[in-house]
Amino acid sequence: MSLLPRRAPPVSMRLLAAALLLLLLALYTARVDGSKCKCSRKGPKIRYSDVKKLEMKPKYPHCEEKMVIITTKSVSRYRGQEHCLHPKLQSTKRFIKWYNAWNEKRRVYEE
């Protein structure tokens, strides 16, 4: 043990420690904000014919489930809005199944 007083760390070390602490705090808050899935609730009742596009996005790090996003036609009552459907709901699974069947049938008639 020394009798001499300890020297304070240099200013650059204190700045580096403060910057590292701020970076860790920013990463933690970003993770907390982004931890919720967009498709956590049941979506509105939409007819197959009102759907312009159906997208199935893969799992992301912030969400444990895949995302099912539909875009409605601009002439429908939803006026081109995007809706996210909960992928585990039975109604969403049925919607995807019947939308794909309806879309295949529609393609045959359009060709």
UniProtKB/Swiss-Prot annotation:
Induction annotation: Up-regulated in peripheral blood lymphocytes in response to bacterial lipopolysaccharides (LPS).
- Report the locations given in the UniProt record: Secreted
Q: Got a GO cellular component term for this one?
A: Golgi apparatus
Q: Which branch of life, at top level? A: Eukaryota
Listed InterPro entries: Chemokine_IL8-like_dom, Interleukin_8-like_sf
**Residue numbers of motif D-box?**
67-81
Endpoints of the signal sequence? 1-34
Q: How is it modified after translation?
A: Ubiquitinated, followed by degradation by the proteasome.
Tissue specificity comment = Expressed in heart, brain, placenta, lung, liver, skeletal muscle, kidney and pancreas. Highly expressed in normal tissue without inflammatory stimuli and infrequently expressed in cancer cell lines. Weakly expressed in monocyte-derived dendritic cells. Not detected in lung or unstimulated peripheral blood lymphocytes.
Principal location = secreted
Tell me yes or no: is Disulfide bond among this UniProt entry's keywords: yes
For this chain, one GO molecular function annotation is: chemokine activity
Enumerate the Gene3D superfamilies for this protein.
2.40.50.40
The entry's keywords? Chemotaxis, Cytokine, Disulfide bond, Secreted, Signal, Ubl conjugation
**GO terms of biological process kind:** antimicrobial humoral immune response mediated by antimicrobial peptide; cell-cell signaling; chemotaxis; signal transduction
Point out the coiled-coil segments of this chain: none
Q: What pairs make up the disulfide bonds? A: 37-63, 39-84
RNA-binding as UniProt keyword = no
**Domain-related comment:** The destruction box (D-box) acts as a recognition signal for degradation via the ubiquitin-proteasome pathway.
Its function, per the record, reads: Potent chemoattractant for neutrophils, and weaker for dendritic cells. Not chemotactic for T-cells, B-cells, monocytes, natural killer cells or granulocytes. Does not inhibit proliferation of myeloid progenitors in colony formation assays.
Which family does the similarity line name?
Answer: Belongs to the intercrine alpha (chemokine CxC) family.
**Protein name as catalogued:** C-X-C motif chemokine 14
Q: Which organism is it from?
A: Homo sapiens
